[in-house]
Amino acid sequence: MHPSELREEAMVASMVESIEIARSPADVFSYVTDPSHLPEWQESVVSVRREGDAPITAGSRVAVTRRIGRRERAMTAELTELNPPTSWAVRGIDGPVRGNVRGTIEPLDDGTRSRVTIELDFEGHGIGKLLVPLVVRRQARKELPKNQQNLKDRLESGAQ
């Protein structure tokens, strides 16, 4: 990739995907904000470990190992926003690739269904400045719709 293409790719807007799920916003929020569930619905997540035993709140951190391309990369994510049952936000705080995620949940059909929208962007640091445009964004563009379908399938099959 030519350097001008890297700069152009780095300025691309965040990715946004929505999906409708036949579960209440409270059910969706409870599941999606529990870090232990990440490997169940996010394809690239290899493992998750919470830092501390306190209940999940804004400021809570988790160590997440993801498969990016052919390698596994560890990073720490911090929950920056937690507004049950309507929104949450997470940001990567270390590692070469730092994801920034914002999720919103809208009630549908008198709250019996939900529309989940996830907005995702990345910051590259060090080698991550190359990884983000060359590998990470492409992988995420393919994975985000699959992850949302996985989330829908898990929740509609009765996952708690």
Where in the sequence are the language-model features?
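Beta-strand/loop substructures that line and gate deep hydrophobic ligand-binding cavities in soluble
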Residues: 89-146
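Hydrophobic ligand-binding cavity/cleft-lining segments
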Residues: 2-52, 57, 150, 157-159
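Hydrophobic pocket/interface hotspot
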Residues: 27-32, 38, 62, 79, ...
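Short, surface-exposed coil-to-beta transition loops
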Residues: 14-16, 72-76, 98-102
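A short, structured loop/turn motif at beta-sheet edges
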Residues: 25-26, 53-56, 81-85, 104-115
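Short, cysteine-centered beta-strand-loop-beta hairpins and adjacent loop/turn segments enriched
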Residues: 68-73, 124-127
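Short beta-strand segments that buttress and anchor functional surface loops
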Residues: 61-67, 88-94
